[in-house]
């Protein structure tokens, strides 16, 4: 039988068989891959004419052209290639000569598997065998006689294999040359193509090429390229091999060639997994991007073929059934390129002996190394392939979930890095791992016989489990570092690419919709199954497995990391065994809010990650039973022993799939792990890994019962909170199962939203109450209630003490003090001071300052969220009265002078995450405070929590911890707190203590994730997966479970308590403004989410009760906030609700009023700063007008609003409409009250009221969210208003605009700028924030301007009422929905808006100076033209325009000089200028008067410049403090900065927080609010000052 094979023989001698089909030639993803840069990605096409048996080449319009015989062929036109034509693609160094090999395929060859592979599906199996078994290959190719034929084929194939220019096909083409190779060999034997080595060429090349083809098909299942060709070459199947490899039927199918055309070779893009030569393991068609790695044992010749053949069959079968198992290309594997450009693959080709970069399998150093590794190359190849495969396709692995633990210890030596996947299958296949892991024998076995497993293949799966366990243990810190080492490979695999992780997370979520909490809950599920298997043994056995081959494991981990990184889809494990690396990663994680401390990362992540995967799956597939069994076992386990078992057992499930894997998508899970460890779900998940799996389970199950029993939801809570000790035994199986399904998420989601949340919250509160004295509402303790009070679950909650925050997770049985301190972090008892709250995300750690912790304010300091994000508390506990510093994001850090404490954070890098954290922390804080209060009320241990309960009640203040601390203690007396405590305990207990941590963390994580989503940049690594999962969760109807009707539902879906609170402001959070929103909003939301939880879990009455309680606690306006939020979300009419909501949401308002103005200003100002931009963000949804009005009060709310925009754009829209309606109504009605409240009262009080009112009238608007949700934000807003007199005044006025009477307020506020002196520190803070904001805002302003250039003006008009700054961010959003309002207020809006970006304050000050009507944005409707008139009259357009131009010029000169003076801030200048310019671009007025617009633009520019100057000159705001009065000069800007920075500060924080996180959503508003508020504020203040002057 003769067949014609056409080859392109490169000048280097490499031969590339041309398949009888169209192939692409190019640099990427092409069958013939050339490495020359002159070759386009898709350069040319070579087609085949079956009738004429000739090939055509067509240049695909490549840049450098395609040359045939040195003649450039026309583009897009087929040119027939003749024999011996010289083809050159681009300027590739290789010239290809077209050669035709007429090879007669001997019968033997026809019988050869290569030919057979196409005919028989078993070819695939054969291929691996063959590759592995040279003997097979030899008989296969008849090394002696057929070898010439096959040799010919082989040379081509070989060249194709290692040198295949074709993307993947060259490999399989060359391999298919197995069929054509004989031809090539006969005819082209002379060709150096075969230089690789005759023997290897013969058997190996041939053998594994041919088999690889089928394999490629089967593995890839992508016959698109290769299966089509399979028909071409009927490869005579080699009877012996085919039967053996019937499994690779797919391959045969793919090959499909059957014994028809001999030349089919490429027909089935065969993946050459030559066990002997990994380099050879090329999928001819690159089809095996993952399969490439499958079988390329370096240097493996056919010698071990027989053994390999068996293994290969298995591996091939696995690969066929699990593409994820396909080999990954080894270092020596160069399947992608022809290696035409050697330098590209210098490293890869290092071992290649030939100039062209080709090398025979025998020459593959990696292969040889692998063979030398001591593992049979075949076994090694197979294992490597499996490992690679596992590693390769985490998602596929997830789906395929084949439990392959490939022993790479011995074989890994050469290919360890490439074959680290021994953990892949477990990690890659968490399900498989789970399934496997759940097997007691597996779990236990791996633990005990880990070494054996490491050594033996049979122990592979077990080892995978054990490794997982080890990893978990490592994370937990229970196993020795060595044990951690083995775990890491799994972690790596488990980590999977974020994509895979996200995918898995999503799949898991989808698989267990009911287990929506599953992401967090699932981990427990998985742990349960895993642990049950090794339940008792898991604890003890795990350590042995971890130690197993520690170095090997470590090496593998490193190698695996390498391979994972090479794959690019795998995220590097953070659970590095390397202490330094771990610490560095920990720091990074912490900075990014991931807070994956070694314990968290390892225990939580590892345990957690696979759990999520497996948990969901298991819950789907019956993991529930295992889970229940596991939980029961845990329950039965001794607490002391349980933790280890949990460490090992729980982490094991997650270990393979990964700690990072979960970490990423499950920042949720992680956060839930981190705090959740503390929490009941996390306790199980993260805590278990820490060493209290049983405890964790217990905590989780019974936690809520007693509290829930207390509240209407009590029964359900108890039922759900199986974790609690009381119900642990009885309910643990079912409860734990349910909770594992629901709790993990509920943990992260405050375990309230899904019915499973309720119990968690209830459980946590119950535990908190029980342990209140010791743990208070510490998530760790609360969740671990089953644990001895003193027995901390190390991984429970990464709220480690300052000293042991990271240790906590690691300490399986951390000292009670440590655990407690951590636990009490939530409940700022003395231990709490040291504790840090780690959001369920693991992203935010709320650090309760020990200093605060001492309850200086009693209840007020109870809730120290000084560092929303830091694991370790801030440098020093702030004064009890001082607000805990939430230096979650750089703005805050800068603001506080980065407040030494804040500086403790590693949040600078995690700017956005920190913002999220702020938001989440605010929510968490409020929750924890309320829960702490509840716990105190119930446990009486922590009086502060009751005080904070107020804060918790009005999470607004919680959002602004400061406001929470100082204001809430007073305004929200303990009386409401007990009610709230009960309310929160039952509805938001999850959010309160442990659940609060989890819920808040979950809310935070979700808010952070949602915010993060828009905010992609900061949390890109883990944040993104987290974001995705959070978003998935958010969009999943978890919160919806509680409030399905809510538009907020999607977000709420996953956060019952925290999510409800976060979900209510979830959009803001999602937008990234939600962080503040979360913080600000949670005070009210915790009850609301709690209430919703109650609703979902217990009953409407429960919710009503908490709401009623919240209502009773007028100071903490959680229920109205919640109700308003719900209304807004559901009905979009927050107007009436907001009135109460504004008041309630203005928890901070009374609070701020109660507080010293300066303190309020400072606390609120910083929070305001953070919150205001959030408000703005909210505005982006187009709810700006009403929102803007309260935006001042609730910048954060606004920010939240914008965040909400992502989550509830529709709601935002509805709200925007509602706001318009409400604004019109409220503008007349509430606005006057606002005016009164604000004008008559102290700025704070007025602001508070205005905030309340603003919230009221903006109840429809997202700002209402902010106001309701973020009382602190409102407080902050009003503080901002007070603090940033011009801006705050503007804000006030802006609000006033919403409430017409506010105009008076504007007047009142006008003097306030001087009153800002009191808030000097705050102003300095604001100045710092404004600096940061200026940078961020500059960028954001540009983006916003680009996005909403004109919208800003519109937004401004709406926000104008709410202070251009405050509303500006929200204005753009608001602008969208409130354009009608804008129309009404256009004159003022335009002025305001123009003021907002460049002179939000400036314009305001200017307005105040010229006309208080500048603030009439609120009163815009009342006197929309007044402002214009005032502007016209005051500016006297021409003179004003000239003046503004002169001012602008002078300001620019000054800015230039300042830039020179502050060159180190040049970048900041540029950024600021860019942002400012972008803002200036924003249409200032919707005024027909172009002169006014130009003036406004000029002034805006001036404002921007001044802001830049202010930021540069006085980044710390110290000058602002010195400058009590507004100055025209840049120095005055700091003075103005007080007012301006203060005024600007709220937008600034919002800007940084909302803008950065929600920049995408709020681009326009942010620019308006962020850029202009932060930049324009100083600028505007100076401008305003100038005008005033």
Swiss-Prot record:
Modification type Phosphoserine: residues: 360, 421, 480, 492, 536, 597, 619, 655, 711, 721, 746, 748, 751, 753, 772, 829, 853, 954, 972, 986, 988, 1135, 1179, 1199, 1356, 1362, 1545, 1548
Compositional bias of kind Basic residues: 1029-1038
Biased composition (Pro residues): 520-530, 538-548
GO cellular component: cytoplasm; microtubule
Modified residues (Phosphothreonine): 542, 1304
Biased composition (Polar residues): 957-972, 1221-1230, 1363-1374
Gene3D superfamilies: 2.60.200.20
Family: Belongs to the CEP170 family.
Purpose of the protein: Plays a role in microtubule organization.
Name this protein carries in UniProt: Centrosomal protein of 170 kDa protein B
